[in-house]
UniProtKB/Swiss-Prot annotation:
Record's protein name: Co-chaperonin GroES
A Gene Ontology cellular-component term: cytoplasm
InterPro entries given in the database record: Chaperonin_GroES (IPR020818), Chaperonin_GroES_sf (IPR037124), Chaprnonin_Cpn10_CS (IPR018369), GroES-like_sf (IPR011032)
CDD domains: cpn10
Database matches in NCBIfam families: PRK00364.1-2, PRK00364.1-5, PRK00364.2-2, PRK00364.2-4
An individual GO BP term: chaperone cofactor-dependent protein refolding
Presence of keyword Methyltransferase: no
Region (Disordered), start-end ranges: 26-48
HAMAP family attached to this UniProt entry: CH10
Family, as annotated: Belongs to the GroES chaperonin family.
Xref: SMART domains: Cpn10
Function: Together with the chaperonin GroEL, plays an essential role in assisting protein folding. The GroEL-GroES system forms a nano-cage that allows encapsulation of the non-native substrate proteins and provides a physical environment optimized to promote and accelerate protein folding. GroES binds to the apical surface of the GroEL ring, thereby capping the opening of the GroEL channel.
GO molecular function, one term: unfolded protein binding
């Protein structure tokens, strides 16, 4: 099943971070924070302005993004946990 976000929303898959500390200690699942990085899987058509025009989104599918710990709404699609969030929830795009 594919999911197509509407307007200024995007679908993001979290990128799992290291489960080890710098000192080599393995962290149990309960001690790990939710990842705040992800890959954009799909984007909506854009933000609808007050004058009716649509502004294209700055992020695109394939971008690696940073977002706040509590950003977006978690959904399960085909057993995979994804996030749907507004583009404004994105703090930045990782480049390089």
């Amino acid at each position: 099943m594919n999911i197509r976000p509407l307007h200024d929303r995007i679908v993001v898959r979290r990128i799992e971070e290291e489960t080890k500390t710098a000192g080599g200690i393995l962290l149990p699942g309960s001690a790990q924070e939710k990842p705040s990085q992800g890959e954009v899987l799909a984007t909506g058509n854009g933000q609808i302005r007050d004058n009716g025009e649509t502004r294209a989104l700055d992020v695109k599918a394939g971008d690696k993004v940073l977002f706040g710990q509590y950003a977006g709404q978690t959904v399960k699609v085909d057993g995979e946990e994804l996030l749907i969030m507004k583009e404004s929830d994105v703090l930045g795009v990782l480049e390089g």
